[in-house]
Amino acid sequence: MPLAQLKEPWPLMELVPLDPENGQTSGEEAGLQPSKDEGVLKEISITHHVKAGSEKADPSHFELLKVLGQGSFGKVFLVRKVTRPDSGHLYAMKVLKKATLKVRDRVRTKMERDILADVNHPFVVKLHYAFQTEGKLYLILDFLRGGDLFTRLSKEVMFTEEDVKFYLAELALGLDHLHSLGIIYRDLKPENILLDEEGHIKLTDFGLSKEAIDHEKKAYSFCGTVEYMAPEVVNRQGHSHSADWWSYGVLMFEMLTGSLPFQGKDRKETMTLILKAKLGMPQFLSTEAQSLLRALFKRNPANRLGSGPDGAEEIKRHVFYSTIDWNKLYRREIKPPFKPAVAQPDDTFYFDTEFTSRTPKDSPGIPPSAGAHQLFRGFSFVATGLMEDDGKPRAPQAPLHSVVQQLHGKNLVFSDGYVVKETIGVGSYSECKRCVHKATNMEYAVKVIDKSKRDPSEEIEILLRYGQHPNIITLKDVYDDGKHVYLVTELMRGGELLDKILRQKFFSEREASFVLHTIGKTVEYLHSQGVVHRDLKPSNILYVDESGNPECLRICDFGFAKQLRAENGLLMTPCYTANFVAPEVLKRQGYDEGCDIWSLGILLYTMLAGYTPFANGPSDTPEEILTRIGSGKFTLSGGNWNTVSETAKDLVSKMLHVDPHQRLTAKQVLQHPWVTQKDKLPQSQLSHQDLQLVKGAMAATYSALNSSKPTPQLKPIESSILAQRRVRKLPSTTL
């Protein structure tokens, strides 16, 4: 089912009485009163032997790039390693001040280090280094560019139960692994579930985790986020790993409905609801989802699914997960439903701007008490994976220049970082200039967009999400001064595709096939992701260098591009699109995809014929050109057509079909014999008209098309209800 993010989730809900508990005291008697043990440390002491690497790390080995988050006793930075063996690699560095940590927090920090050093799992964040100075503790972790699941919920991507199932299944495997090590997570909430750049999850923030000595041992300390707490945590009667499965149910409920199952007006009321309230079960959820939620929301932990001797296997066997291939899931072979919009390696677009806009500064720590250093004695760790099998350090990665991407909307001055050079091109809403980065002297292009004429947010998001494709222009930097947005991209040194082709002394049909194959693959990738370019004229297809190699082509200028969205303006996962999108929305998407294919057909025709199909030159009127386009008639005889293969003519005809819904799809273009059997194509030279005449005719064609339709205005998505509901609860750190 599509998941309705409800304003008020309780109408039409079945109230489910949760099982009464034997021996559980009421909230007034237990969980809602301050515990006399609250100040007593009851954490279990953990010691681990960790195999050391070749050298211990220290703060000087890391270059601070950005602040990612900040809490009451520390910060999280984006850092770059500057020493071998992993120089140039990006990490998240968690810095905790010893002097501001209470004793129980100090033990939690050492616990987090010990747990992470012992855990190696595809869905748990990896610890690479841990060390201390006189006043601080340092944890060096994976830098996960996709942000957290909290962000996904608050931005309300339209997803289905199948999509939620993917995240919950990966989460179940991660929790199962922690439980197998005797670790109770205890702080399971969306903020602590991060996404990598592909969209897979990683559990993080183990400050509240507890390592149990055995399955009979229970923990008693009061910890975690109250809305996600299990009843036995609330009433402090002791809890085991089954408390995590209650929190897992809360997370599942929230992801499926957009609301928390137990939330009062304050902390005390919320705790009372957790201990006593009947659960409102939304009837739009599948029977399988409702069944799993009921099995997880058992107030008696002994009756809760996942608490038995089989542990997580009970969860995995539930009918809700009948479609999951757990082995494929563990191997990360199942494609995530959502790909975060991240591009460059030091990209922090998905972290809170309140933190990322701050100048990174690792402030000196206050001298700690004498006892603090003893507590953290031996607190250092180097991941063994940073060593080769023979004990020699790994070769360093290619050096990364020190351009640090700036957040869109950060109000930094573009000219502080770049010197602007000559104009490259001018459009209706923007102009493009060459620029030089002051710190590195590297050349880029900058597209300066007038915000009063066009909202660039869709273009930025598409470039961030898909710009890592080898044949899509790469976004390097974004600035916003209020009036203009500056998009810094790689510089296209090789010029336009048609310029290069028509200036060649020899250009053959076989070479044209290689060009179309490269561009077709890129368009097929975009269409498969629900993105249509809608302005694929040859002047927007350029070479990144002067080699003329088809693999060096880039599709540029996504100013008219669109991502497939629901009627409410939200993005949709592929599962949502396939099952719940209105026919007229899909028809419109098919029309837009057909327009992209038509543009590729125009390009193919021009490469083969040496002239454009519907315009004779720049002096043709828009009316004349549109009449020819509307008739769907173009010549495939005379000139080059006398030597061009029949398969080429067949492909051109099917790409330029007058009915957009009868044109080939990008996938069908790639499967056409003219593309798949390049070695059979002629290598004879193709002639062409004068370059300026061809380019003038091409410009006239697209000018006529653009004059015949109004330009749609893209509007930014308003803040969601869920985001507003949870904004006051934003965590101080996402790591």
Swiss-Prot record:
Q: Where Phosphothreonine occurs along the chain?
A: T359, T573
What name has this protein been given in UniProt?
Ribosomal protein S6 kinase alpha-1
Family membership noted in the UniProt record? Belongs to the protein kinase superfamily. AGC Ser/Thr protein kinase family. S6 kinase subfamily.
- Record the organism: Homo sapiens (Human)
Q: What is the lineage of its organism?
A: Eukaryota, Metazoa, Chordata, Craniata, Vertebrata
Q: Which InterPro entries match?
A: AGC-kinase_C, Kinase-like_dom_sf, Pkinase_C, Prot_kinase_dom, Protein_kinase_ATP_BS, Ribosomal_S6_kinase_II, RSK_N, Ser/Thr_kinase_AS
**A cellular component term, taken from the record's GO annotations:** cytoplasm
Q: Where in the cell is it found?
A: Nucleus; Cytoplasm
Domain Protein kinase, chain residue ranges per copy: 62-321, 418-675
